[in-house]
Amino acid sequence: MLKYDVIVIGGGHAGVEAAAASARLGVPTLLITLKPENLGEMSCNPAIGGIAKGTLVKEIDALDGLMGYVIDQAGIHYKMLNETRGPAVWGPRAQADRKLYKKAMYQILTNYPNLDILYGKVEDIEIKSSKIEAVILNNGSKILCQKIILTTGTFLSGLIHIGQKKIPAGRVDEEPSYGLSNTLKQIGFKLARLKTGTPPRIDGRTIDYSKTILQPGDKIPRPFSELTNIVNVSQINCFITKTTSETHDIIRENLDKSAMYSGQIEGIGPRYCPSIEDKIVRFSTKSEHRIFLEPEGLDDYTIYPNGISTSLPEDVQHKLIKTIPGLENVKVLRPGYAIEYDYVDPREISVTLETKKIAGLYLAGQINGTTGYEEAAGQGIIAGINAALAVKDQAPFMLTRANSYIGVMIDDLTTFGTIEPYRMFTSRSEYRLSLRADNSDLRLTELGMNIGVVSEKRKKIFTKKCEDIEKIKSLLNTLSLSTSKLAKMGIQVAQDGTYKTVLDLFKIPNFNVEQAIKIFPMLKETQNNNILQLLYIEAKYASYLTRQHADINLFQSEEAQFIPKNIDYFKIPSISLEIQEKLSSHKPTTIGVARRIPGITPAAITAIIIYLKTKYSDGSST
């Protein structure tokens, strides 16, 4: 009988990261997926990154994950979003060639040390004494294991809706999983339904681009991965069009035929990625909505019209598309659809992503209520790391709100749960100026090195980058000009007779890296790895970062105050019954987590701290 230490079920974005992370830690790992050609499949839009999402990708890369490196082998349109705003909200993004992305992912995974891939379907999980024993395939065979990571995406009781038509599926032309849904219910997990959707795909050869707006990418693509020196993939343009009043009229006239508005769909859809029906209803005063025409590949004429996700009947989809400028004669290749699926209340997992009910069972991705490739991948890498560390009897790896967006996401999910698809935003992070995309490796790579999940190649790159940062920082502190000379150059500084270093100049409003290079041409040679830009940001926002670091220190002190697992909140007399019940239900692991539970008052936190000091003066957390 086959036996592996870790088995990952599902080969989507969470699954591939989980499997690779577990394997990197030297643990024999098996990835079970339905189709070999769909490893890392982009089920919806052909893009990676975006605002906050791009930071997640950079954090995954910092831990030696796959997503950033793979998109650099397949990215055909790079763009830094929000670049006119502050660096805390910059969002690296890249359109992908779907075929190149899957090809690169397949090549990496099929040659990954300690990782085997099995093409099959898991029907059940065998559990004994609340511990994982094995997975059972649909052919009846059994594979023994210590840990299981479930990354089922939209496959748990998946149901596609196109108008009144219902198609049981986890994705187009792929059957859903009912067995695992039933298993989770029998164990006692709280399952609910969520919904997501995708737009129709159209033939780019039938688009009149003269009626659209050109959207070029960045002149020089900025890679996602620290392993990528330069993006060698050919770059292409995207285009923008918009809906019209006629489009809106057709949608309103057919709302009763939409699966979403006819009452046919039970699940709640993503608030921040609504269907076109939702947009017309919720934003009824808007006369138009933008649509981004995104190519799906270099040699693929399929276009993804980002902005018109829909569950309307096929004939209605055809009508509304032809009212959009440039799409009047377009050929629809595949209809859009909505899909419903089961998910588990994420409050049933710990911050390691291990379930509280079953030891050795981990959940990652949409099964935890998230939406998006990047959110799934971020959970996948953490689940994979922790499953492998548990096999090796090593301490778990936990990211926090203070050091990563991944930590923010996991804390939000495990503390508050979610009743709608959770998407990452910069606004969810209290410390977003410190948690930028450009410093992800400086925040996380050393943590990954400490547990052994980072390769030797990445270690060398990271070590050299840290050395280069110190050298360039020293140079910036050495190069200087007098205030009088700066004034002659038109740079507004106080005429105090002093000399200003480059780092001093970076703090001046509207002074930027390009000006610094113009004044000191030798700095052009230091632009490798965007180090100069990084030091510019650190200098520009130094006072804000100092204050934020003080806030982070306070946060970390509360996170370090552990609450014993066996605490009885009903024995703390000075807090209300309502709060006692909330705390007993949530089971917070630290004072910091307890403080973030809705409805928990500062007075209650003080009472808990006092109780812990008197009852558990030895600091025990067992």
Curated annotation (Swiss-Prot):
GO terms for biological process: tRNA methylation; tRNA wobble uridine modification. GO terms for cellular component: cytosol. Keywords: Cytoplasm, FAD, Flavoprotein, NAD, tRNA processing. Its cofactor is FAD. InterPro entries: FAD/NAD-bd_sf, GIDA_C_N, MnmG, MnmG-rel, MnmG-rel_CS, MnmG_C, MnmG_C_subdom, MnmG_C_subdom_sf. It holds the Pfam family SAM_GIDA_C. Homodimer. Heterotetramer of two MnmE and two MnmG subunits. HAMAP family: MnmG_GidA (MF_00129). Belongs to the MnmG family. This is tRNA uridine 5-carboxymethylaminomethyl modification enzyme MnmG. It comes from Rickettsia conorii (strain ATCC VR-613 / Malish 7).
